[in-house]
Amino acid sequence: MKRLLMVVAFVVSAAATAGTGLEKGFIRIWRENGQKTRIPVTAERMRDGAYRYRLATKDIPRTAEFVDVVPEAAEVKKCDGYWVAGDNRYGRLDRDKGHFRSVCGHLQMPIFGVKTSERCWVGIVKGLRLEFILNLAVADGVYHYYPRFEISRIEFDPYEDIVVDYYELAGDDANYAGMAKTYRDWNLKRGWVKPLKERVKGNPALEWSAKSVFMRCKLSHCDGHSRDNPAHAMPPILWKRTFADYKKLMKSVKDLGMDYVDMCIVGWQYMGFDGPFPKLWPVPDELGGEEAMKDAIAYGKSLGYRMSVHVNNHNIYRNCGAPLWNEDDICVNKKGHLRTYGYLQGGLAYHTCFQVVNNRWLDSDLRHLKEMGLNGIHHVDVTSARYPTPCHAPNHPANRREMAEWQLKTCEKVRAVFGGYSSEAGMDHLAPGLDNALYVGTFGSAQQPATELVDGEVPLWQIAYNGIIMSQPYWATVDASYGRGKDKLKKLSDPKRRKGIHEMKEMNDYLWDPAHRTLKVWEYGGRPTFYFNDYATLAPMKEMYDAWQPMKHLVYEFIDRHDRLAENVYRTRWANGEEVVVNYSDDRPYDYRGRTVAPLGYEFYPKGTN
């Protein structure tokens, strides 16, 4: 124990500032037998001002279940302040008791922070970042908020040091925007990501996307989203549109004056949407076959559009058949069993191993798709929607970090062929390879349950990544301008249909109608995205398309500030000085900078506005 104390205890440099509560703390090790060890720690002061807590890989006990990293500042008495998490959730520091625990594998960013009247700090997990959760416990009005590393869930030996850097924030940066900017600046300085402005240079496909709305159209899908269907039986297929129908839809979009649209064909492949991936061919005759698909792609390009498709590299089904289905190639759990993902439209899905994806079929798939004439950024389902899954297959083992590296290799290959990579949810282990997130938010989705300590969301991810990754806020704000209906959304949140999905309405009342959903897109700097509707009318899409035109350049700009100006009124300020103010009130206008923001309305303040 004395040796361990020496390893983890550090000396603070003379430049350290006293009184932040970040200089000292402790590391707590929970062992699988129930024993726990508390080790006092003095943080190392880094050149960038961070207070660093480190536990070397060699000093992480292999019998540990958890390791907590807890500075003194992690203990906060109930006060007028708030906490935030890397999945955008926040809560006021006004409770007497309660517990919040992030779900492992669904924290978009490895950051967390606290703001009180006395201090503001942000923590960034820089080592073993794929293996921790956030733990927030409140008892007798005292909060304890810290990262917990789940050592027993790694499935391999710990593969890197635990490193957590804490930054004290002051002045105009002493808020959640400052927390997100601190994280963004660190990512930019280390070259982890590059601004979108730089990446579009010499990349016409990505440049097109940056000025286009995203329109996804589903032609067909399997109807096997049920445990009642035998695990490996071919489910029935619902045919919705042919390629001839799709051509007519694109013509209607063009006729309405929507010139900048990223067209993405969904459900085009063998057995339709969520059919037996990774098998893509033959293109179903019911849709018109491959020649009709090539014709539709060529027609869309003749209208001036960029054309892309939806695929899935994350899931594999037995129904894909030989030679794609080979049990030696599937992701394997620690017990040696094939990892099942769950029941999707195509039936029971298994996890792929991305080493196999890269080495077996990705290159040939991309080559075939390119030969069909596709020229838009490529959309790949799931990959950035969850953390990487470890694999214990003897021929292709990988821990989470190694699997993330293989995922990034797929991004590199896709970018080399199509200019950009699109996926969903924005888990930022994929940030270096991600160009577009179909949605970001976890509120009301499968990823995060409700908790008594959560009061809402703030655009933490958007502040960190707007100007780097294109996005729109939530699953619920896809088709924002369309009336989707409460019943349809509630049906998807029925736990009997999909384990883990929780009621959206409790925390997202304001997102149930087109007006509120559209305001959320503008508030969060979103790129309008359309997918779940049948496009029986294009008027709502056209309305949102037109509204976005004066603001669409903001996809290139960093967000520097986000504020609550009044009840139900919020302001977003970009680095170029431009602002958007949204008013969620049903009946109260709000005056700002010489303009009146109408109830359920917004105002854009471009450069030169008084």
What are these regions (language model features)?
Residues 19-268, 285-287, 299, 303-306, ...:
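Carbohydrate-recognition beta-sandwich/jelly-roll modules
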Residues 12, 187-190, 471:
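Short, flexible helical or helix-coil boundary motifs
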Residues 212-363, 371-379, 384-395:
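Aromatic-lined carbohydrate-binding/catalytic grooves of carbohydrate-active enzymes
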Residues 1-4:
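Positively charged n-region of N-terminal signal peptides that target proteins for export
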Residues 131, 141, 146-179, 223-239, ...:
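Active-site-proximal substrate-binding groove within the catalytic cores of carbohydrate-active enzymes
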Residues 73, 313-315, 427:
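Short beta-alpha junction loops
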